[in-house]
């Protein structure tokens, strides 16, 4: 009996302790005031709100209006927020600038604090206000609004008629003081007052005409307060906290203390012992069960039950179970399908292997057909040891030219097409796709590769390598971006604006490169097709000699070779044309024609030239003989200061184009004379430094070709090219 009495006393003591610690409200507590619900820990009478903190004690007046202190309550959130209405501050003036009204807001929030969801706002012209707060520490800030008319932009509080700044959380004392810079005399008609107030973010939309005049007659604004239980954390209160069943505790984000919330699957008031009640997901349609399943509510959750003949998957969906006989046929079908797929995959792999082998054999066939064996033989055989030819792959060339797209075409000619290519390292090159038809042209292509690979000169286009795996071979050059000398002198793509200094320098550079080929290369090289269309110019107008498809290496023990005549009409050496004997003087003659083109600006062979032979060499001689030398010189070139230089250049051109090769100078001598001519000044008179006109006439007069030499075409794969078209065979 004594044990039972002891247990009864303990139970009574526990219930009294629980009521004291958790402070649960009485059953008769008011739960609504007007249209605002009053929920624990808030209350309106003793025993109905959280004990020990008068901040939770709200007042419901006779008009059914709920107040927190002197602030009307809008609503409350059990997650830790209370919305109230806070009076605005203002200062007003008459038209003379005399103060007529002043209200400064001063508010104490008890144990509650300002939320960071509020904004400090100032409305008025030439106005400013201060916000002073205190809590754990003091904080002050201010805002300035400037304007001179009521036509400021609506909806914006950026400082013109309206200013708005954030407010930090955690402060329990607020003081707002409005001011004016000049007491509003100039704006009194539309803005007699300065207004300052706190307002919840997004709850004030500025309208200049209404707000600057009387702030739309609004005296209070919604403000968000943070609240929490006590001054300890969840860990410190442990089970002694106010949180009820099926709830959890979390530390307040607005300052000290803690708040409560219902667990997932429960809803209600977490501050009451049984405030968090289970949510019936099956009734509230908060479940995700499929149409074939049945929802079953459980405490804090739910289950999706599948009917007979169905099974539940991971997404709470019910799928029909597979019958044994159906499963057996499914196995057979899947086995057959997988087996067939394996066989087809094997056949596909075999086809790919065969296709790869055929492609490899085809590339090897093209390699041999395009002279790969010949190239390897010549590189590895007797001859110069400095040959360095890079072999590019078919795949690399296709990617570099974007599949040989027509937008990449730089030009087309008798020997093929030239594309602009971009290599993987982003370097730009010119890719020449040869147009070959027989064995001799393959040999000429390989010859061009070998010749260019041995040349290292700044005025000779540099070959980077070749690709022989394609149906027609490809040659990869450095990219020269400013066209040919022919384009600049006669073409329509560029203005014919080369000055005499440009032309003399170009002539000197070409002469120097030919002298190098004839005298300084490991084995002498005769270009055999020197013409303006085979001289490229870069962006600095530096000359680059190109197109070595017709070039020949001269053995060290020979001075000339007997070959099939090859070249271009107008530039072709008459002696070589008549005898078939090729030597370095053939290049000298062709260079002389190029020099005449630079002097005259006229084409080497032109059938539309009036009163002058069609061949430029004959035309030059005829003009000199008839005292019309000045007429043949390009008008853009000659002036009073360079007549002697042009006369000297004409003399060099005349010597280079003599009929007999033995009477022509060597390219080394021509290059030296042109280089010396470049550095000469014009301070000496014409008569003191240069030969008489008669001597020029003699030099040019003996060069007139016969009618046969003038109109006959050269023999070879490049002999019938039209010199009036854009020729870029050199790999631009």
From Swiss-Prot:
Record domain EGF-like: where: 230-277, 278-319
Annotated ranges, domain Protein kinase: 404-677
Transmembrane domains' residue ranges: 330-350
Extracellular side: 24-329
Cytoplasmic side: 351-732
Listed InterPro entries: EGF-like_Ca-bd_dom (IPR001881), EGF-like_dom (IPR000742), EGF-type_Asp/Asn_hydroxyl_site (IPR000152), EGF_Ca-bd_CS (IPR018097), Kinase-like_dom_sf (IPR011009), NOTCH1_EGF-like (IPR049883), Prot_kinase_dom (IPR000719), Ser-Thr/Tyr_kinase_cat_dom (IPR001245)
Positions that bind ATP: 410-418, 432
Active site as annotated: 529 (proton acceptor)
Location in the cell: Membrane
GO biological process: cell surface receptor signaling pathway; intracellular water homeostasis; oligosaccharide metabolic process; response to salicylic acid; unidimensional cell growth
SMART domains: EGF, EGF_CA, S_TKc
Matching PROSITE patterns: ASX_HYDROXYL, EGF_2, EGF_3, EGF_CA, PROTEIN_KINASE_DOM, PROTEIN_KINASE_ST
GO CC terms, sorted: membrane; nucleus
Similarity comment: Belongs to the protein kinase superfamily. Ser/Thr protein kinase family.
Protein name per UniProt: Wall-associated receptor kinase 2
Species annotation: Arabidopsis thaliana
GN (gene name): WAK2
């Amino acid at each position: 009996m004594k044990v039972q009495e002891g247990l009864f006393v303990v139970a009574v003591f526990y219930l009294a302790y629980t009521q004291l610690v958790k402070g649960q409200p009485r059953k008769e507590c008011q739960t609504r005031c007007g249209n605002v619900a009053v929920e624990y820990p808030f209350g309106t009478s003793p025993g109905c709100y959280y004990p020990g903190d008068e901040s939770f004690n709200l007042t419901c007046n006779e008009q059914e209006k709920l107040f927190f202190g002197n602030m009307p309550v809008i609503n409350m959130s059990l997650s830790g927020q209370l919305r109230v209405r806070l009076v605005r501050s203002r200062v007003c003036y008459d038209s003379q600038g005399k103060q007529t009204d002043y209200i400064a807001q001063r508010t104490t929030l008890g144990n509650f604090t300002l939320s960071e969801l509020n904004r400090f706002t100032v409305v008025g012209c030439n106005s400013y206000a201060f916000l002073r707060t205190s809590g754990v520490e003091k904080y002050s800030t201010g805002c300035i609004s400037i304007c001179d008319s009521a036509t400021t932009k609506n909806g914006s509080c950026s400082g013109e008629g309206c200013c708005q700044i954030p407010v930090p959380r955690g402060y329990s004392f607020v003081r707002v003081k409005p001011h004016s810079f000049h007491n509003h005399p100039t704006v009194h008609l539309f803005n007699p007052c300065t207004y300052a107030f706190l307002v919840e973010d997004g709850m004030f939309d500025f309208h200049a005409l209404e707000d600057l005049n009387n702030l739309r007659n609004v005296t209070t604004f919604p403000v968000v307060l943070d609240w929490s239980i006590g001054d300890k954390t969840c860990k410190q209160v442990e089970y002694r906290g106010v949180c009820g069943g099926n709830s959890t505790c979390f530390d307040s984000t607005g300052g000290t203390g803690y708040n409560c919330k219902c667990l997932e699957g429960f809803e209600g008031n977490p501050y009451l012992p049984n405030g968090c009640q289970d949510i019936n997901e099956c009734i509230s349609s908060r479940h995700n069960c499929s149409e074939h399943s049945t929802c079953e509510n459980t405490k804090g959750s739910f289950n999706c039950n599948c009917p007979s003949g169905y099974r539940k998957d991971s997404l709470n969906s019910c799928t029909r179970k597979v019958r044994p006989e159906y499963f057996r046929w499914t196995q057979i079908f899947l086995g057959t399908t997988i087996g067939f797929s394996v066989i087809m995959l094997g056949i596909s792999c075999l086809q790919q292997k065969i296709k790869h082998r055929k492609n490899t054999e085809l590339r090897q066939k093209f390699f041999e057909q395009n002279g790969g064996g010949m190239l390897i033989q010549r590189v590895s055989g007797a001859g110069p040891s400095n040959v360095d030819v890079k072999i590019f792959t078919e795949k690399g060339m296709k990617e570099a030219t974007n599949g040989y797209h027509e937008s990449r075409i730089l030009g087309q000619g008798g020997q093929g097409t030239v594309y602009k290519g971009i290599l993987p390292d982003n370097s730009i090159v010119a890719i020449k796709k040869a147009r070959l038809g027989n064995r001799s042209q393959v040999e000429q292509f390989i010859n061009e590769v070998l010749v260019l690979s041995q040349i290292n000169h700044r005025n000779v286009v540099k070959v980077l390598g070749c690709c022989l795996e394609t149906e027609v071979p490809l040659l990869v050059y450095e990219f020269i971006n400013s066209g040919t000398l022919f384009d600049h002198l006669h073409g329509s793509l560029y203005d014919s604006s080369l000055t005499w200094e440009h032309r003399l320098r170009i002539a000197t550079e070409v002469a120097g490169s030919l002298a190098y080929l004839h005298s300084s290369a490991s084995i002498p090289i005769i270009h055999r097709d020197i013409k303006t269309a085979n001289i490229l110019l870069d962006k600095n107008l530096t000359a680059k000699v190109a197109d070595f498809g017709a070039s020949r290496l001269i053995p060290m023990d020979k001075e000339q070779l007997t070959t099939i005549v090859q070249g271009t009409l107008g530039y072709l050496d008459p002696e070589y044309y008549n005898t078939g004997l090729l030597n370095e003087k053939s290049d000298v003659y062709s260079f002389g024609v190029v020099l005449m083109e630079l002097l005259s600006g006229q084409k080497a062979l032109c059938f539309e030239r009036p009163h002058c032979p069609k061949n430029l060499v004959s035309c030059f001689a005829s003009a000199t003989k008839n005292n019309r030398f000045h007429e043949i010189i390009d008008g853009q070139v000659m002036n009073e200061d360079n007549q002697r230089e042009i006369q000297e250049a004409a003399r060099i051109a005349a010597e280079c184009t003599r009929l007999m090769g033995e009477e022509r100078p060597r390219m080394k001598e021509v290059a030296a004379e042109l280089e010396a001519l470049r550095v000469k000044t014009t301070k000496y008179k014409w008569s003191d430094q240069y030969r008489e006109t008669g001597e020029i006439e003699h030099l040019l007069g003996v060069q007139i070709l016969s009618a046969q030499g003038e109109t006959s075409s050269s023999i070879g794969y490049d002999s019938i090219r039209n010199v009036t078209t854009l020729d870029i065979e050199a790999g631009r």
